[in-house]
Amino acid sequence: VDLKTNLKEDHYLQAMLGSIVIKTQQKEYRPVDIVADVLTRRDTTHAVLNCGDFHLRMDTHGGYKKLLSRLDELQGEVMSQLKNRRIDQVAIRREFPLGRITLTTGKDNFISRFIEYNGYHFKTVDMDLRTSPISGLNGHLNIDSLVAQGVQLDTVRANVMTQGDTIRYTARIVNNKKNPQYVFQALVDGELAERGSDIAARIYDANGKLGVRVGL
């Protein structure tokens, strides 16, 4: 562990944890080394966490105190709007911190195994999200071979983008012909609106025929 601080705004931590053994009633886990690299100053916050094929990175403008304050203000704004049942996307966007968070992971790491222990399985996850009080929320989330509560989804692709004053999103869920449960393709398009969210969904069967079309 390497720790440096001025006991004010500047803190730096670099650490490696190894030789860890975690026991549950069913299995014993011996995760590979966990490496953490965290830096925060008045003008920036940077964090990296690596463990096997798990790689998480976060970079934001401003120190950790400013980041926590912005997140608290964002939460307060969202909760207030939900209570009033009226969404003001511009007001929400003003509270976004300026930052980016990326995640790539497979199954060969302690965190994925812990998630699996809790009943969720996946092959790979790839996420890239960017927030800004000017450009809003933009990014993607890709998941391959997701199993949740006994339901297997072969491919999940989701995107979020801010266009003008509106946050829009798309999603595609595909189960190929080798899926043992259901073969289908679902497409979702939507955007946040003042009174909630406008959603359009289409579901195609194994032959590519449109089976369900829903607009809310």
Residue ranges and their predicted role:
Residues 1-216:
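Interface amphipathic segments
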